[in-house]
């Protein structure tokens, strides 16, 4: 995409507030629908579990979408993402600003959905690696599993996987004892 047609942060700020999720990947606008109720329940359960752990063992800042993570604000390669959840360790607190997070958080967490599966697994994973996000979790409601990745050089390697009811530590946290089965929603009522 040429710089003239690339989306910039200024273009991004002018987008409507219409319940869609807008991101810019290397100057290209990416639009996805609002998350499903299942997605939101998983996110809520995850945030609750992490909030029990973070203040006492891993000081830092836990935030969740919608929140702009501005990986690059250059006119020719603007990249703005909205991970479902993110963690900022104390050594990265300077990244916080009125606009959002300006740089790579310590941990980005994406909950896969039918409309974002390829974007999260391929596009955003590549962007997070390029911009130096040390850790990435991909949560898959279909397989009821969590993959935790650690950045080595310019690529992610699997650091841990989690499924079922076994408590597990996932990097960058120690002593977390996250129980994956506690994240999944109970089946919704039919109406």
Identify the role of each PLM range.
Residues 1-191:
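Gly/Pro/Ser/Thr-rich low-complexity, intrinsically disordered segments predominantly at protein N-termini
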